[in-house]
Amino acid sequence: MKKTRIHRVWILFLLGIMACLQVRAQYMPVVFDKKYGDKNQIQLVCPLAGDEVAMVGKEGQKYNLTWIGREGEVLFSLPLAGFTAVNELTELEDNRILLVGQSAVMNTKGRKDNVTLSGRAVILDRSGHIVTNIYAGGQGSELMKGALLRSGSLILSGMEPKGGNSRQGILMKVDKSGRVIYQYKNAGSGYCDQFEVLGNTTEYICAAFSGDKEKEQTTVVRLDDKGKPYYV
C-alpha cells in the first residue's frame, strides 16, 4: 500500500513537471540579437502584428526603414529618401505603417507654391511599397503626428514657420491624394503633436497645441468636421 502511494506521488510529480515544460514551451518568447547597419542609430520602434517590428534608423543625415520578422529576419529595408526628420511611426490595419515628419519635396515640377521643404506623410505596406505619399504644409513646415480615418483621409498635425523666427501649430485634414479638406492654425502656439479623433457619427478632433519658446502658448482646441472650433 505504501509503495502504491509513493508511485502515485512520483507519477503526479512527473506529470506536474511535464505540464510546466509544456506551458514554458508554449509561451517561450523568441529572442534574437542581431545587427542592423554599421552606424545605424535606431530612432523609432513600432511593434506590429505577428510579433514583427518596424524600425526607423538614421545613418549620418539619412533615414532608413527596416521591417523585421518574428525571429529578427529582415523582411525589407529601404532608405527614406528626402526625409530630414521622422517624428512618428504608427501601425495601421492590413499590415501597413504610417510615417510622418519633414522632407525635401522630391518633385517640384508643376507646383505653384514653390515649396521645397515641407511636412510629409507616407503609408507603406509589408512589402515596402509606398501606398500613399503626401506633402503637406507650407515652406519649412513639419509634421509631428498623423492618423488614418476610415474614409482614407488623414489627420496631420505639426508646425509651420510664420515669419522671422516664430512658428505656429497646425492641424489639417487631407484626402488620399493630398488635397487639403481643411486646415486649422493656432497662431499663439508653437506646434501640435497630440490629438485624438472623437465621435461615432460626427467627427470631432481634440487637439493640444503647445509651445516651448518665449510667448508661445499652450491651448486645447476641439474642432468640428469642418476644422472649426467647436463649443459645447
Stretch-by-stretch model annotation:
Residues M1-P29:
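Bacterial Sec-dependent N-terminal signal peptides
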Residues R24-V232:
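A sequence-level/structural motif corresponding to short, flexible coil/turn segments enriched
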